[in-house]
């Protein structure tokens, strides 16, 4: 069976197995994300403590991702992913059991979030660079777009299901079902033949590998641009796990089910953007499109600061979802293509560092501003900061020669 052009990466059998497993496990992961935020607000009622949770979960990405990117180039990627996926499943199971039996406290959630962040620091660059091993450069654009579509389809399904389950059965179900969802991707990895073999020279130190990756990335003007754009949008826009629950509880006054639908609106928009990119055959970075997407996403945050209606919030979150994923997926694809095979894990670790490593700062600031002022003020401040930074990057790009 041959898949149509828009799904052509699925013609690779191992990628197809990996893709199906990722879809299921990511639905579970989004269920956990919603459940975790709701649980913290139930336990503490504090926007600052919710923001601190995000800081703890993503701090390991900031601290260690450049080293784990070098690790991804040194070890068989399939085996690394087996270890990380099993570990994530166990962490979800532990949290679910603590909640089920009424023993959970805020510090439990923080410790488990920190451990999850440590595992994800290894998992994310390995998973990103493994895609190229599964499909080759010819289909990498389509594969990255399909991955984005899967991730964001899960962002639709997971929050809706989690919201309904939390409202009906309790928050523990989000964590227990997430643990169960990882059995599919673990089974897929066990059946795959592609190992994602190491590509670095033997006898070199990991620090030398890290230095080589950093030097290469900083020497290429286009990669510097991509990383700067990614930094701005990740820092200001992608704090949905803090923005949206606070909006739901403090501004819109909706229950867990309403919160789930708000998170799903972001996912619907993101899937729309990802599928649009998936039909592109030529992986050229169209800078005007990417910059426009960034301005729309940050402008959407400014508009969200004035929103008090549930349906308007859904529409605005959809727009932010479309625009933000166009920028992020374009950066992901362009970085994959710009990196030589031997350096891809290290270059993608910089993607992970910026995309995930900004969350400790962004989520803490959103929580802090929301507690001191309001979540609407946090939206406004982030939006204005993002628009200003993007304008400065545009001026830099036009003034610096090739």
Task: Spell out what each predicted region is.
Residues 1-8, 208, 396-402:
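Intrinsic disorder in cytosolic terminal tails and internal cytosolic loops
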Residues 129, 133, 175-205, 394-402:
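Helix-loop junctions on the cytosolic side of multi-pass membrane transporters
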Residues 45, 100-104, 167, 171, ...:
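Transmembrane helix-loop junctions in multipass membrane proteins, especially transporters and channels
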Residues 2-59, 219-264:
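Helix-loop boundary and gating motifs at the non-cytosolic
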Residues 62-67, 74, 80, 94, ...:
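C-terminal transmembrane bundle of multi-pass solute transporters/carriers
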Residues 19, 35, 51-54, 81-82, ...:
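Hydrophobic/aromatic positions within or immediately flanking transmembrane alpha-helices
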Residues 16-34, 56-72, 76-91, 108-166, ...:
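Substrate-agnostic recognition of the 12-TM MFS/MFS-like secondary transporter fold
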Residues 37-44, 96-101, 157-177, 250-251, ...:
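Transmembrane alpha-helix termini and helix-breaking/packing motifs in multi-pass membrane transporters
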């Amino acid at each position: 069976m041959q898949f149509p052009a828009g799904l052509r990466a699925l013609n690779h059998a191992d990628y197809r197995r990996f893709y199906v497993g990722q879809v299921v496990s990511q639905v579970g992961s989004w269920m956990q994300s919603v459940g975790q935020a709701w649980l913290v607000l139930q336990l503490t009622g504090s926007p600052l403590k919710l923001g601190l949770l995000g800081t703890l979960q993503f701090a390991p990405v900031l601290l260690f991702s450049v080293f784990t990117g070098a690790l991804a180039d040194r070890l068989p990627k399939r085996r690394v992913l087996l270890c990380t996926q099993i570990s994530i499943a166990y962490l979800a199971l532990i949290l679910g059991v603590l909640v089920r039996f009424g023993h959970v406290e805020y510090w439990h959630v923080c410790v488990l979030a920190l451990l999850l962040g440590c595992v994800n620091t290894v998992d994310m660059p390995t998973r990103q660079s493994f895609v190229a091993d599964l499909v080759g450069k010819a289909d990498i654009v389509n594969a990255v777009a399909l991955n984005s579509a899967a991730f964001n389809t899960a962002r639709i399904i997971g929050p809706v299901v989690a919201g309904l389950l939390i409202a009906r059965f309790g928050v523990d179900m989000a964590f227990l079902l997430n643990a169960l969802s990882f059995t599919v991707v673990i089974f897929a990895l066990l059946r795959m033949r592609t190992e994602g073999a190491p590509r670095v020279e033997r006898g070199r130190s990991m620090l030398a590998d890290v230095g080589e990756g950093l030097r290469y990335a900083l020497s290429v003007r286009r990669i510097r641009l991509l990383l700067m754009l990614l930094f701005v949008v990740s820092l200001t826009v992608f704090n949905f796990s803090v923005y949206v629950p606070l909006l739901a509880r403090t501004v819109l006054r909706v229950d867990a089910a309403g919160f789930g639908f708000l998170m799903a609106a972001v996912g619907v928009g993101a899937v729309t953007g990802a599928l649009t990119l998936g039909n592109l055959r030529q992986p050229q970075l169209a800078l005007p499109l990417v910059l426009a997407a960034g301005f729309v996403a940050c402008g959407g945050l400014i508009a969200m600061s004035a929103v008090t209606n549930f349906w308007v919030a859904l529409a605005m979150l959809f727009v932010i979802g479309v625009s933000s994923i166009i920028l992020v997926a374009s950066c992901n694809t362009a970085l994959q293509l710009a990196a030589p095979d031997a350096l891809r894990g290290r270059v993608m670790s910089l993607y992970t560092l910026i995309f995930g490593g900004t969350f400790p700062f962004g989520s803490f600031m959103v929580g802090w501003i929301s507690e001191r002022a309001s979540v609407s003020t946090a939206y406004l401040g982030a939006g204005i900061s993002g628009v200003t930074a993007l304008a400065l990057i545009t001026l830099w790009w036009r003034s610096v020669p090739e």
